[in-house]
Amino acid sequence: MKRLLFVIAILLIGKIHAQENVFLTNEYWKQKPSVAQVEQAINQGNSATAFNSRAFDATTLAILNGAPYETITYLIDLEGNGVDKLTHDKRTYLFWAAYQDNVPVMEYLLKKGAKVNITESHQLTPLLFAAVGGRSNNAIYELLLKHGANLKDTNADGANALLLLLPHLKDLKEADYFVKKGLKLTATDNKGNNAIYYAATTGNRPIIEALMKKKINVKNLNNKGESAIFGAARGAKRNYNKLDTFLYLEQLGLSLNQKNKDGLSPLFVLAEKNKDEKVINYFLEKGNDANQLDKEGNNPLMKSAISNNISVI
């Protein structure tokens, strides 16, 4: 019993220490601390190499919050960090620097031998991670390619950097760099999703319209028989589309009640993530069946109960 209490006490002390570590808070790094200030905090007992509960460390948070270059490079060089240290989702510092469009820090890491052809837990390389983050600065990609990255790399779904970047672009001209490098606007991923499907995930009308002018098929169906409506229904990682996006796609001739090869309508996808009641109601009005079942016997209500809010349920 005493041994158990001792172990619990040690764990609690460690947890309290982690909670008190100023380096593991975004607020500290938003103040843009200097090297001298970081050294002072270290001398006060804060660890510049420890992780928080999500495997973010001081260097990662410094990069994500735009800390000064000198501060970030100081942290990188501390014993216990280094260019190959794995952080959240098995990402090295090069991933975070590319994601934040921090070319100077990328250059520093690459000079220190940072690897460019590695993948994190979601099978993204630093180059693909920058694209997923919507980074259109060509200097990021030029630097990575110069150090051996492959622009033709794809994620686990077979999507290349161009497809991953398209949802975030404001002007299709921003894609010219990738097209000149050999990537094609006509590309599809392993699931058969085309460029317009990807643009639809963020409801990116300017890009959808520009792609249609390039003869990209707005009515393309993927391997599961799904149109861009399903892409819009799935949305982006942290965002969902509003009703105006679906009204726009409907005006382009896409059916809101189109079923995929499993017999499921877009409502089945919407119920899991989209929190806009107007969207849900509109799809119901368009004939989407609230009682449809997937192969596991789940219906839209069950899907919404797992991850959506009470108003949608």
Locate the predicted segments by residue.
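Bacterial Sec-dependent N-terminal signal peptides
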Residues: 1-23
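Sec-dependent signal peptide cleavage junction
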Residues: 16-45
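Ankyrin-repeat boundary/"N-cap" motif
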Residues: 20-29, 50-63, 85-95, 119-131, ...
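Ankyrin repeat A-helix N-terminal signature
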Residues: 31-33, 61-68, 96-102, 129-137, ...
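Ankyrin repeat domain, specifically the short helix-to-loop turn at the C-terminus of the second helix
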Residues: 40-47, 73-81, 107-115, 142-150, ...
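Mid-chain, structured segments of secreted extracytoplasmic proteins
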Residues: 57-107
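Solenoidal tandem-repeat scaffolds enriched in leucines and small polar residues
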Residues: 134-254
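Eukaryotic tandem repeat interaction scaffolds
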Residues: 221-313
